[in-house]
């Protein structure tokens, strides 16, 4: 519990500091590394800044990992030059994540927004991040709610990550649970929110999330579970897929059909509560649900 509170405090502090840093970047002249090295003593804040610099370096490396080998070689050749970059210069280098993401979208399995059913998008929002259209990269209200719920239950029942954070993690980061990775995730999620619309972020999420049964992305998931293209999915199938990311193995409708169907009904209930569908729609969908045999 204490670790989680500390993590939340750090994330909020970094978030505020980053936004302040954006303004400072345009007005402040920062000392070069060579000037800093002439100082005989370093203040304690220098260690903190150095740690955050390392985080930016890690993110920059992951972004560059999406480029081709030749580009990586060029960056390696420039290593000496990059070492002399200031904190805010490094920050500026990771602000534009579009090239890496646009290249990712060229993947043959990438499904554009207009081929993804609106009901699937609504099912994901109702299940994963119901305030998705109301908050930015981080949802303080949702995070607080999850914290309280998990504390009362004395176990993890709800996650606090937004769809934007999950998308950033899916594309750029590993799934290790460390403070450094969480901060990296937040910075990248902020860039997603600044560079893309909500619908574009949701489309990226659906193309990168793990749906279980060895499938990543909505194209493979729709084919694996239902033998269909994403655009052909009905309400029941959309609800089933929207409910998988939280526990894809447990809710796998092929290996665990009963649990999978219960999960589908939970998602339909959530969609009804959010006003996306009617109770009649949910009951009809339950009767129409059929899974492709494994």
Question: Language-model segments: which ranges?
Answer:
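Juxtamembrane regions of bacterial inner-membrane/periplasmic proteins
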Residues: 2-294
